[in-house]
């Protein structure tokens, strides 16, 4: 499977540079965006999935970033507020938070800036995997807080076979697998993906 991660990383860097910054990256497990960490001074890479953090550690090792990136198993809402960061990044993870507005409120107490990267509700990929409502809720939370800047981008999820697509969505349940099977038969193995970035002012108590 391949969304063009390199392209997304380049777009994120153009949107908001991490150069010299202390960064908290939320939903970092798996390590898809390790390339983004290269210019940061320090990255705490947070995820609540131990196996995803194992994958992150391996990618960090391969990129030679062990001295810059610290994987952390945990929950954003339970982090102590004494720790402060220059920037907090939601890596396509805000829509997975139980209450995105609560997560954003917490984020804004930890970092000077909050950067949200997530799927757009209009994205065919978000619809196919059954996440349109969660994504819409996440972006309502962003707009309720008031983004300083927001941009949209488009790309594709590209699969080499129907079997690869079905393996990718298998953890999401039989209904999503059925949706994916129908898409592959009707539309092929390239699924459009629309995503957005937003920047919010942080370091507030509310």
Predicted regions and their residues:
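Conserved class I S-adenosyl-L-methionine
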Residues: 115-141
């Amino acid at each position: 499977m391949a969304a063009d991660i390199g392209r997304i990383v380049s777009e994120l860097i153009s949107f908001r540079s991490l150069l010299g910054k202390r960064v908290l990256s939320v939903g970092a497990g798996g390590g898809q965006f390790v390339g983004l960490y290269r210019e940061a001074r320090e990255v705490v890479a947070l995820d609540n999935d131990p196996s995803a953090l194992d994958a992150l550690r391996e990618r960090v090792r391969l990129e030679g970033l062990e001295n810059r990136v610290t994987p952390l198993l945990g929950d954003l809402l339970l982090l102590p507020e004494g720790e402060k960061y220059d920037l907090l990044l939601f890596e396509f993870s805000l829509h997975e938070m139980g209450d995105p507005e609560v997560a954003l409120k917490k984020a804004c107490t930890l970092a000077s800036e909050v950067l949200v990267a997530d799927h757009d509700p209009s994205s065919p990929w978000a619809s196919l995997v059954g996440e349109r409502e969660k994504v819409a809720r996440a972006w309502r939370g962003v707009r309720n807080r008031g983004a300083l800047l927001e941009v949209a981008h488009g790309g594709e999820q590209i699969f080499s076979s129907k079997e690869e697509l079905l393996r990718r969505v298998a953890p999401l349940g039989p209904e999503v697998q059925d949706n994916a099977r129908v898409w592959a038969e009707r539309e092929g193995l390239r699924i459009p993906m629309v995503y957005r970035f937003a920047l919010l002012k942080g370091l507030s108590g509310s």
